[in-house]
A protein has these predicted regions:
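Substrate-binding/active-site clefts of carbohydrate-active enzymes
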Residues: 1-20, 27-31, 37-75, 79-199
Length: 199
């Protein structure tokens, strides 16, 4: 059962609500619950698809809040334990292909491409300033000390120096769009935030 929808309030109560509903879910025959992204997004009111920190489940003071839109890490763990008590599986929605809400800007070379034809460059390479630096200050290296930089991404959607949106393919050795996406309109997979380079 999907236990969320796009327009839930930003009140931090979803994990508590699901926990309180666990026995009822069992009684009506629910055997699995699909929950929204539990980690910190770029803003508290975000549904969780603008991924900021996969290691922050509502535990650290980052992006102006400790809890996520849905609650705290402790509430999440209690909710999962309660569902498991009633033999209900939990499926977590996770976004692994992009990051949002960088902590600092970096300068790097890009080529702007046609948003409707990603394989078509609109000019020569040039330098932009993008929000591609992730240091996760509030987490202080707990769970992971990995820091993200521009070279971990294949594209970005905003040049902070010019305050301009676009589809910017990051340049460098081995940098390219993913091959395995729909070829409609020339690699139609849309760019959201900072596209993680999975190659």
């Amino acid at each position: 059962m999907q236990y969320f929808e796009w327009h839930l309030p930003n009140d931090g109560k979803l994990w508590k609500q699901i926990k309180e509903d666990a026995s009822h879910l069992r009684d009506i025959g629910v055997t699995a619950v699909w929950i929204p992204p539990a980690y910190k997004a770029d803003e508290q009111q975000d549904e969780g698809y603008a991924t900021y920190d996969l290691y922050d489940l509502g535990e650290f003071d980052q992006k102006g809040t400790i809890r996520t839109k849905y609650g705290t890490k402790d509430e999440l763990k209690k909710m999962i334990d309660e569902l498991h008590k009633y033999h209900i599986a939990v499926y977590l929605d996770v976004v692994l292909n992009h990051k949002a809400g960088g902590d600092f800007t970096e300068k790097f070379m890009v080529v702007e491409v046609d948003p409707k034809e990603r394989t078509k460059a609109l000019g020569e390479p040039f330098e932009i300033q993008g929000w591609t630096g992730y240091s996760f200050h509030g987490r202080k290296d707990k769970h992971s000390d990995f820091k993200w930089h521009w070279y971990h991404f294949s594209g970005t959607g905003f040049d902070d120096a010019q305050k301009r949106s676009g589809v910017f393919q990051i340049q460098g050795e081995g940098k390219a769009w993913s091959e395995g996406v729909d070829s409609e309109n020339g690699n139609y997979d849309f760019l959201l935030c900072n596209d993680i380079d999975l190659d």
